[in-house]
Curated annotation (Swiss-Prot):
It comes from Ralstonia nicotianae (strain ATCC BAA-1114 / GMI1000) (Ralstonia solanacearum). It is an enzyme of class 2 (transferase). This is 2-dehydro-3-deoxyphosphooctonate aldolase. It is found in: Cytoplasm. Its EC number is 2.5.1.55.
Length: 284
């Protein structure tokens, strides 16, 4: 699949979607994107900057949601212009799709909305690539239906049907907890869409702090290594210069100063994993 100016897939090196959970300021966005561009450029990892203008599903009404669509899109446009990287953000309503698609390179759908047929179809008809997150409540094989909805919508609009990614971000495991089943990454390949692993939301503890979500960032490297060793097209990770002060999802954000070391390990694993193909394809 062609994404931005590079190809993605199991026969290609993994690409990275990374950035702060929510846009906190223009300077932080530009600085973070610049640091990530420098790191990924040195490692040869294709990179897309991600940050949200609105967190529409926060745990409580008191939680910081973001700077709003108008200001958020202005900042993302500046990141794209000044840093020279493609940008991605999530949308939550059909009315947001057109203005957001006019600015960003890639759209992302929230996990909670993966079953909303009209929403998925509208995103698919935007003309932009879409990273579709699997709901925490959804079986991995059910993502085929979601991807098929997107493909059918694209076909109806006369658009390419190969512009969609399937993103794993963990499955609900009792109350306030998620678990990652690495088999899901192989199962989701059967959708025919490139598979992305969200390593930071997979260690989230939803609502675990009462009025906000908790997280276990120490397990991000563990799950990221496992996912890359399983074989994925891309990795999604949220990062922050100072996670303790982050306005959203700080407990599961990777400290920006640790990204180079983590990505270096993932790059080596990815090369090794994809060098000789996938044995599971021979187990029939």
């Amino acid at each position: 699949m062609k994404l931005c100016d590079f190809e993605i897939g199991l026969d290609r090196p993994f690409f990275l979607i990374a950035g702060t959970c929510v846009i906190e300021s223009e300077q932080m966005a530009i600085d973070t994107a610049g640091t990530l561009k420098e790191i990924t450029g040195a490692l040869g990892i294709p990179f897309i900057y991600k940050s949200s203008f609105d967190k529409a599903n926060r745990s409580s009404d008191a939680s910081f949601r973001g700077l709003g669509m108008e200001e958020g899109l202005r900042i993302l446009a500046e990141v794209r212009r000044q840093v020279g990287v493609p940008v991605l953000t999530d949308i939550h309503e059909i009315d947001e799709i057109k203005p957001v698609a006019s600015v960003v390179d890639v759209l992302q759908t929230p996990a909670f909305l993966c079953r909303q047929t009209d929403f998925i179809r509208a995103c698919a008809q935007s003309g932009k690539p879409v990273n579709i997150k699997k709901g925490q409540f959804l079986a991995p094989h059910d993502m085929k239906n979601v991807i098929d909805k997107a493909r059918h919508a694209a076909r109806d609009a006369g658009l390419p049907e190969d512009s969609f990614m399937a993103c794993e971000r963990g499955a609900s495991f009792g109350y306030n907890n998620l678990v990652s089943d690495m088999r899901s990454l192989a199962i989701m390949r059967e959708t025919g869409a490139p598979v992305v692993f969200d390593a930071t939301h997979s260690v989230q503890l939803p609502g675990g702090q009462g009025t906000s979500s908790g997280g276990q960032r120490e397990f991000v490297p563990v799950l990221a290594r496992a996912a890359v060793a399983t074989g994925v097209a891309g990795v999604f990770m949220e990062t922050h210069p100072d996670p303790a002060c982050a306005k959203s999802d700080g407990p599961n954000a990777v400290p920006l100063r640790r990204m180079k070391d983590l990505l270096s390990v993932l790059k080596e694993l990815d090369t090794l994993t994809k060098r000789n193909g996938f044995l599971e394809n021979q187990f029939d």
